[in-house]
Structures are given as structure tokens and as C-alpha cells.
From Swiss-Prot:
Catalytic activity: 1-(5-phospho-beta-D-ribosyl)-ATP + diphosphate = 5-phospho-alpha-D-ribose 1-diphosphate + ATP
Originating species: Rhodopseudomonas palustris (strain TIE-1)
Modes of activity regulation: Feedback inhibited by histidine.
Gene3D superfamilies, per database record: Periplasmic binding protein-like II (3.40.190.10)
Free-text function comment from the UniProt entry: Catalyzes the condensation of ATP and 5-phosphoribose 1-diphosphate to form N'-(5'-phosphoribosyl)-ATP (PR-ATP). Has a crucial role in the pathway because the rate of histidine biosynthesis seems to be controlled primarily by regulation of HisG enzymatic activity.
Protein name stated in the entry: ATP phosphoribosyltransferase
Highest taxon listed in the record's lineage: Bacteria
GO terms for MF: ATP binding; ATP phosphoribosyltransferase activity; magnesium ion binding
Residues annotated as transmembrane: none
Pfam family, one: HisG
EC number: 2.4.2.17
């Protein structure tokens, strides 16, 4: 029996809820046969898949080791904890939740410090005056070093933070911070501001693949099935299905609809009886319906699409190109 395909998802909180909802929308229902406290799960219909419930940081570490095939975790953790991340893991797709920015934040009282260039001047002057480097509180050590090096900021030292990083300047353990934020409200409440060019990374939850995992033929086929579900759901979300029938429809009219409303005709032009099926961006539905009625359609129906399966699967093609041949 072949080894299981391991999908790692967050083990608690909103990230777990959002991850499970994302897969459910794609027709992949995650469940825990052992109960809510079980840290192993399954996907209905995919018997060889084992779902591992881990913390977001553990997921990144397991992706680096190759002990999981797919994992759901933030890009910030991937970039911070995996050396040469682009060679070892693949960010297959952003999942549309878990948004947050990794930022450089300084005290609001530093009214003349707005950019990284300003920060360079201040850190240099601080060292000359106090004979020590400015302290940066953060848990993003590698991201901070890389970003500061890009901006030629060298007169600083990192103070590793295990939590409540935004409070470090107020209690005197650091002069500034690098931290993750969604709205900036917590930073502002602690008297901090984000530098104008201080957004280091715009992160969100991603579906990530490990190059180091055991990519047997069975594992690749399982990945193809999972990504086919996800791609079909994503494709369906871009369109509504529009159906009508009228004798006045011809190639010229269809070409005009394509160019004006961004529609696609997945099954070709109208049938001999004039039946036409189009996929239309939601924002163009009313305009398309008016256009079709102006040209002879009596009735135009609109329906939501659950899935649109296509011969090509761009997500799996992306994965296949990344994995060892």
C-alpha cells in the first residue's frame, strides 16, 4: 500500500474554519473521524489522503522537511522560516483569507521619519550619539534582515519577540518593531506608525506544495484531483451561466458579446434551434441580458455555477513544472 498523501491545515481558530470552508466550497469535505479533538482527518472520496491538523508554523516546517505534500499556511511564515523557499516549496495559489502585512513600524513621535531612507539616517545618528545600535523587536528575523539590507540599513540589532511585539517600544525593550498587521489599529493604539515604504510583505493564506515530499505517481494523481476541484471552483466563481434561445443569433452578434461583455461560449455558438449558453462575468449580467433582448431574445435566464471543469488545469500544470521530473 502506498504512503498517504498528506494535506496539512491549521489546527484551530479562524484559519482552520476558513481552510475547511475553502475546501468544502471546492467539493472537498474535511472531517475528523476521531472527533473534534483529533489531529488527523480525512477527505470524503479521497481514501489515500490524510489531513494533518497543525499550527501554521508547524505546517511551514513540515513543508520544508517534505513530511507533508500540501499545506495551508501564510506566505509570511513560508518566507521567514524556509531558506531558499522558492526552490523548496511552491505557492500554488492564494486562498483569499488570512490577509496581513509584515511591516516596519516606528513611534508616531518620530515625525521626521517616514521612509526607510529616513530610518537609515536616524539609526546612523543614534549609534553615533549613544554608541549602540537601535533595537528592532520582531519574530520575523530573516525577513527583517533581508528587507533592511535591501534598503542599506545596517545600524540596528534584532531583539527576538515571542509576543506582544507592538508594546516593545513603550516598555523600552526596543526602539521600533517589525510585525504583522491587518488594519494597523493595534499599532496606532500603541503609538506606532508604518513607514511609507515599510510594507515588507503582503501576505495571505496559501496552498503550498513541498518539493521535498515523496511525489510518487499516486501522490501526483491525488494532487491533480485536488487541484482540479479547486480550479473548477475558482473558474465557476468568475462567471454566471446565461442561457437563451433566439433565431437572430449569429457569429457576428456572438463576437460583439464577447468583446463588449467579456463572455465566453463554452459549448460553441448557438445550436440549430438557436439555443445559446454563455458564461458571463457577474458585473456584466444585466448589460448582457439587455443586449440579448435588444437583438431578439424573449427570455434570458441566469444561474450560478458550482464548478466549471476544463481540459486544462493551470494549477496542476504549475505544480508539475515545479516538481522533480
Amino acid at each position: 500500500m502506498s504512503a498517504p498523501f498528506v494535506l496539512a491545515v491549521p489546527s484551530k481558530g479562524r484559519l482552520q474554519e476558513n481552510a475547511e470552508a475553502f475546501f468544502a466550497r471546492a467539493g472537498l469535505t474535511l472531517s475528523k473521524p476521531g472527533g473534534a479533538r483529533d489531529y488527523r482527518g480525512t477527505i470524503a472520496g479521497l481514501d489515500n489522503v490524510e489531513v494533518a491538523y497543525l499550527s501554521a508554523s508547524e505546517i511551514a516546517a513540515n513543508l520544508a522537511r517534505g513530511s507533508v505534500h500540501f499545506g495551508v499556511t501564510g506566505e509570511d511564515l513560508v518566507r521567514e522560516s524556509i531558506t531558499d523557499a522558492d526552490k523548496r516549496v511552491l505557492l500554488i495559489d492564494g486562498l483569499g483569507f488570512g490577509y496581513a502585512n509584515v511591516v516596519v513600524a516606528v513611534p508616531q513621535a518620530w515625525i521626521d521619519v517616514r521612509t526607510m531612507a529616513d530610518l537609515d539616517d536616524v539609526t546612523t545618528g543614534f549609534r553615533a550619539q549613544h554608541n549602540r545600535r537601535m533595537r528592532v523587536a520582531t519574530k520575523y528575523i530573516n525577513l527583517t534582515r533581508g528587507f533592511f539590507a535591501q534598503h542599506n540599513v545596517v545600524d540596528y540589532r534584532i531583539v527576538e519577540s515571542a509576543g506582544a511585539t507592538e508594546g516593545a517600544p513603550a516598555v523600552g525593550t526596543a526602539e521600533m518593531i517589525v510585525d504583522i498587521t491587518t488594519t494597523g489599529a493595534t499599532l496606532a493604539a500603541n503609538g506606532l506608525k508604518v513607514l511609507d515604504d515599510g510594507v515588507m510583505l503582503r501576505s495571505q493564506a496559501n496552498l503550498v506544495a513541498s518539493r521535498e515530499a515523496d511525489w510518487s505517481d499516486t501522490a501526483r494523481e491525488t494532487a491533480r484531483v485536488i487541484l482540479d476541484h479547486i480550479a473548477s471552483r475558482a473558474r465557476a466563481g468568475k462567471y454566471k451561466e446565461v442561457r437563451t434561445r433566439f433565431k437572430g443569433c449569429n457569429d457576428a452578434l456572438l463576437a460583439e458579446a464577447h468583446s463588449r461583455f467579456g463572455v465566453v461560449s463554452p459549448f460553441g455558438g448557438p445550436t440549430s434551434s438557436g439555443m445559446l449558453t454563455l458564461h458571463c462575468p457577474p458585473a456584466q449580467i444585466y448589460a448582457l441580458g439587455s443586449f440579448l433582448r435588444q437583438h431578439g431574445a424573449d427570455t434570458v435566464s441566469v444561474a450560478a455555477l458550482d464548478y466549471v471543469f476544463d481540459k486544462e488545469n493551470p494549477l496542476f500544470s504549475k505544480l508539475a513544472a515545479f516538481l522533480p521530473q
